[in-house]
């Protein structure tokens, strides 16, 4: 019998690239940063200045020297909450319709529309 191809599931993400989020769990709890990258197949996000790890880079040519650099690594999307810069508070997100009938994201605590 032939094996079924396993297709990676794409998770619905409540954050988008460019959103300001606050980390709510883990070693970087309470840190605020901007979402750099979204990985929906893994349900993870990369946040600026969060989950920093040191990476040892090998030299590509003989004349070049190796180096140690710090890079942001992804964290699970359930560990971040959208953050309001106006009110300085993190909040869950809900979906609502604006006056023109377009579906937009809104912060539950403040009522601030994100999109």
Swiss-Prot record:
TM stretches of this protein: none
Keywords, sorted A to Z: Ribonucleoprotein, Ribosomal protein, RNA-binding, rRNA-binding
Matching SMART domains: KOW (SM00739)
Keyword Phosphoprotein recorded: no
Presence of keyword Membrane: no
PANTHER family reported for this sequence: MITOCHONDRIAL RIBOSOMAL PROTEIN L24
Assembly notes: Part of the 50S ribosomal subunit.
Family (UniProt): Belongs to the universal ribosomal protein uL24 family.
Its biological purpose: One of two assembly initiator proteins, it binds directly to the 5'-end of the 23S rRNA, where it nucleates assembly of the 50S subunit. One of the proteins that surrounds the polypeptide exit tunnel on the outside of the subunit.
Protein name per Swiss-Prot or TrEMBL: Large ribosomal subunit protein uL24
Organism: Acaryochloris marina (strain MBIC 11017)
């Amino acid at each position: 019998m032939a094996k079924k191809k396993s297709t990676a599931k794409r998770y619905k993400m409540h954050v988008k690239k460019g959103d300001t989020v606050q980390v709510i769990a883990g070693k970087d709890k309470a840190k605020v940063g901007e979402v750099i990258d979204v990985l929906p197949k893994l349900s993870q996000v990369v946040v600026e200045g969060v989950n920093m790890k040191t990476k040892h880079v090998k030299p590509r040519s003989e004349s070049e020297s190796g180096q140690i650099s710090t890079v942001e690594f992804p964290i699970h999307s359930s560990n971040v909450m959208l953050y309001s810069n106006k009110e300085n508070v993190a909040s869950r997100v809900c979906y609502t319709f604006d006056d023109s009938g377009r579906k937009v994201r809104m912060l539950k605590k403040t009522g601030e529309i994100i999109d």
